[in-house]
Swiss-Prot record:
Encoding gene, per UniProt annotation: H2BW2
Start-end of Basic residues biased regions: 34-50
Pfam families: Histone
Gene3D superfamilies given in the database record: Histone, subunit A
Subunit architecture: The nucleosome is a histone octamer containing two molecules each of H2A, H2B, H3 and H4 assembled in one H3-H4 heterotetramer and two H2A-H2B heterodimers. The octamer wraps approximately 147 bp of DNA.
Function summary: Core component of nucleosome. Nucleosomes wrap and compact DNA into chromatin, limiting DNA accessibility to the cellular machineries which require DNA as a template. Histones thereby play a central role in transcription regulation, DNA repair, DNA replication and chromosomal stability. DNA accessibility is regulated via a complex set of post-translational modifications of histones, also called histone code, and nucleosome remodeling.
Native source species: Homo sapiens (Human)
Region: Disordered, residue numbers: 1-61
Keyword set, alphabetical order: Chromosome, DNA-binding, Nucleosome core, Nucleus
Misc remark: In contrast to other H2B histones, it does not contain the conserved residue in C-terminus that is the target of monoubiquitination.
CC terms in the record's Gene Ontology section: nucleosome; nucleus
UniProt name for this protein: Histone H2B type F-M
Amino acid sequence: MAAASAMAEASSETTSEEGQSIQEPKEANSTKAQKQKRRGCRGSRRRHANRRGDSFGDSFTPYFPRVLKQVHQGLSLSQEAVSVMDSMIHDILDRIATEAGQLAHYTKRVTITSRDIQMAVRLLLPGKMGKLAEAQGTNAALRTSLCAIWQQRK
């Protein structure tokens, strides 16, 4: 019995030594990986810090005065009205994205296409409003793609 316990101790010593030798490189590798991750985060922050419109974040507030000026010159919006409109736009876009995602899921696809977005808009907005929104969105997409093609030709 003493021999069996001595063998058990010897085998536990070798496994603990092996475990220590294995753990040391993992710790060294993990610290290197953590440092690289930290460096990557800092670099990406610097790159995106100079992006235009970054001070507004995910807000549409800078666009409301521009659109209002095109539609009704001389009018202005209160801060409360801007806040309400901003939350409304966020809500509508969230609903469209959710509905388009569900449509893509129903057809067993992982990519949301422009057709999914068109159908989501038609489902969410009633009657003429849906048709008008779809037409405006299609025209905006065409203008954007035509501008991109025009820039490539230059």
